[in-house]
Amino acid sequence: MTLIKSISGIRGLIDSSLNIDLIVRYVQAFSNLSPLGKILLARDTRNSGSKYINHSIDLLNRTGRETINSDIIPTPTAQFVIIKNKYAGGIVFTASHNPSDWNGMKFINSNGTFLDHEQFKKLEEEFNNCPTISTTIDSDLIVEENDSLKSIDSHINNVLNLNIINKEMIKDRKHKVVVDCVNGATSVALPKLLENLGCDVIKINSDYNENFGRSPEPIPKNLSQLSAAVINNNADIGFATDPDGDRLSIVDNQGNPLGEETTLGLCVFYILKYFKEYRKHPIVTNLSTSLVSEQISKKFNTPFIRTAVGEINVVKRMEKEGSLLGGEGNGGVILKDSHLGRDSLVGAAIVLNLLAIETIKINELFDALPKYYIHKSSVALKPKNENFENKIKEYFIEDEINESDGLKIIRQNEWIHIRKSNTEPILRIISESESVARSKELVEIIKNEIK
């Protein structure tokens, strides 16, 4: 298995495509390109992350770089702390929703955001110029230990004091919430935030453990335990995250997974309905995000902008347009007033505030949202279909086509997005329409055209 490189960093199989020699070269390259100052190192609950942090500290100490070892914290916590404490940057060892035998590196610059295309290109060039470096974890490490709980508490305090969050209103509702943190990096942070908001918190898969307890991606088919726990405990809502905590999915009070696209839609609805000043600023999402958020934005006469897939693409456009709210349809909510990164803690607080102010149940809120249905599929990318763009453009010659990230065919109340995967030799095909059957039909049209 080769190393997977994408806009969000690198990923590979532990001690195979991702090994110590490769890691320390990337750490050295990142340090060489970073401004003076401290570099934060953090991880999710994969055991290998601890070893990777220790080797990174040894390398950075020997090159005169001060380090902060935050150990296990969510990726959004790392992003927030880097900005708050004015660090030179940070590296989080995580493979996000990949299985536990994978790990990876997410690189965060001094602005608390992931590297953009140009910055990642420079990192690759610097990496290629770095020699193989020997490290040890037996030396006396000069490291400023930053208790992970201190970082988590700082992040939670930021969320609790956001101008869009009414702590007392949420506390008055005394929500009963089940959380499934996939035994990952939010296992302390998310329950603690909810307890600070007066919630009765029931935890499943919420211990620091590389045995995730379920498939790590927080999509409906993986949330059966959470659904059962919500029903058995007569809870108001269930929250699920991925291992590094930048994605949030919801299960309603009847145990129904609402799909990761719903999270951003609910947050957009709450903020645009109750905070008119946000309507002056565009909502920014990627090309594959549901029409739900777009239709809500239209309802409140708010500009809506789409970018190429990838958190940093959304963030860069938010910065350019002066956007205050954005995200991706995978359960990633980005609120500028906290920090410019997807954040499950921010998403959870917003959804609970929406529940509190609307005084209805989450299934009723979901029923009130615009209804669209996404269907996702893929096909192997073979030489015979590498030129799929021309075939698709010819078939959809009468339709609007966006070519900024693959091909997106846009029609009234439906779309199809076809793009090459950054991580596998496949074409990803995503469609959305007003019915499940129609969305499947749209995907089949594409598959037939590129055979």
Q: Predicted segments — roles?
A:
Residues 28, 32, 39-103, 192-251:
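N-terminal small/polar loop signature for handling phosphorylated ligands or for N-terminal nucleophile
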Residues 13, 103-233:
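Gly/Ser/Thr-enriched, mixed-charge loops and adjacent short helices
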Residues 237, 275-451:
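Phosphate-binding and adjacent anionic-ligand microenvironments
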Residues 1-66, 88-89, 142-177:
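An N-terminal, well-structured beta->alpha segment
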Residues 116, 203-205, 256-274, 311, ...:
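Gly/Ser/Thr-rich active-site loops/lids in small-molecule metabolic enzymes
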Residues 15, 107-110, 249-253, 334-336:
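Short beta-strand-to-turn element immediately C-terminal to the catalytic PLP-Schiff-base lysine
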Residues 121-157, 161, 253-329, 334:
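Proline/glycine-rich low-complexity loops and linkers
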